[in-house]
Amino acid sequence: MDAARRTQAERAAETREALIAAARPLFAAHGFADAALETIVRAAGVTRGALYHHFADKTDLFAAVFEQVEGEVAARMGEAIAASNQTDPMEVMRLGADYWLDACSDPEVQRIALVDAPAVLGWTRWTEIGNRYNIGMVRALLTTAVETGRIPSQPIEATALTILGAMREVTLYVARAEDHNQARHEAGAVINRLIRALSAD
C-alpha cells in the first residue's frame, strides 16, 4: 500500500511538473493573457481536469511558474556568488544585485517575473513570492556586516526591505525601458551607490 501511495504521489508530482514545464515557455512567449489553457494542457499531455486537480485556475498555475523562475534565478545567483570567493558582505550584496539585474534582462525572466507577475498576482503576492527567495540572504549579509563593523548598527528588517524594494523598482524600470542596456547601466550604478551608502557614517 505504501509503495502504491508513493507511486501515486510520484505520478501526481510528475503531472504537476509537466504542467509547469508546458506553461512556462508559453507564458514567456505569449504572455499570461494569450497563453491558452487548452494549449498548455495539450503541450503537457494531460487533460483539463488534471490541470484543475493541481491548480485552482490559470492564475494559480502562473504563480507556480513564477515561483520556479524566482527560485532558479536565486539559486544561480547563489552559485555565482560562491564562485566569486568574495567574503565581504557588502561586496557580496553588490555582486548579488548586479547578478539579479543581469538575470532580469533575460526575456523569459522579464516577461514572467516583471511584466506579467505584478499585474496577474497583484503587488502583495508578487512581493511575497519574490521576498521568499531573497530576503533571507539580504538579512544574513546585513547582520554579518553589522557584526563585523562593516556598516553601522541599523534595523536589519527595515534595511533589508528597503534594499529589496529598491531592487524591485529598478528591475521594473529596466524591463519597461526602451533602451534596456542604458537602463541596466543606470540601475546598476544607482543600486551600487545605495549599497555603498549603507557604510557611511
Placement of each model-derived feature along the sequence:
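Alpha-helical DNA-contacting segments of helix-turn-helix folds
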Residues: 63-69
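Basic, helix-initiating cap at the start of DNA-binding domains
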Residues: 1-30, 34-46, 59-63
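Amphipathic alpha-helical packing segments from all-alpha helical-bundle domains
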Residues: 71-78, 102-103, 123-148, 157-161, ...
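Short hydrophobic/aromatic patch on the recognition helix
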Residues: 45-55
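Amphipathic C-terminal alpha-helical segment
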Residues: 102-106, 135, 139-140, 144, ...
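Amphipathic alpha-helical segments used for helix-helix packing
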Residues: 104-124, 172
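Secondary-structure edge/capping motif, primarily at the C-terminal ends of alpha-helices
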Residues: 80-84, 111-114, 174-178
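Hydrophobic alpha-helical connector segments
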Residues: 64, 78-108, 159-163
